[in-house]
Amino acid sequence: MNFSTPTLVINKSISLNNLDRMIDVANKNNLVLRPHFKTHQSIEIGNWFKEKGVTSITVSSISMADFFSSEWDDITIAFPLNILEIVTLNLMIKQN
């Protein structure tokens, strides 16, 4: 494979098996799985989680929350708020 730009290459069956294992561990421990959507940043992969019953996610920035906000209602931003981004955050909340 030759790629000229950064490209996400993923084995779907391995990823879905890993997701099933994470869900199983959470269920066995009476926990809610709230995965951190950091590396894949993909609506399609996010939908794999939804199809398995995941309803909440964590991201690392307001821009990532904005990216996923059209598909997800329960998003936690796992980093302190930068006060300079408050206008962006308020706009995102109003749009969704």
Q: How would you label these PLM feature ranges?
A:
Residues 8, 16-19, 31-33, 81-84, ...:
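Generic detector of leucine side chains in alpha-helical contexts
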Residues 1-10:
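Generic N-terminal amphipathic, Lys/Arg-enriched alpha-helix
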Residues 10-11, 33-34, 53:
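A generic structural signal for short
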Residues 36-96:
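Active-site-proximal beta-alpha core segment in soluble small-molecule metabolic enzymes
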Residues 14-44:
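N-terminal glycine-rich anion-binding loops that anchor highly charged ligand groups
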Residues 5, 31, 49-51:
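Short, basic, glycine/proline-bearing loop/turn elements
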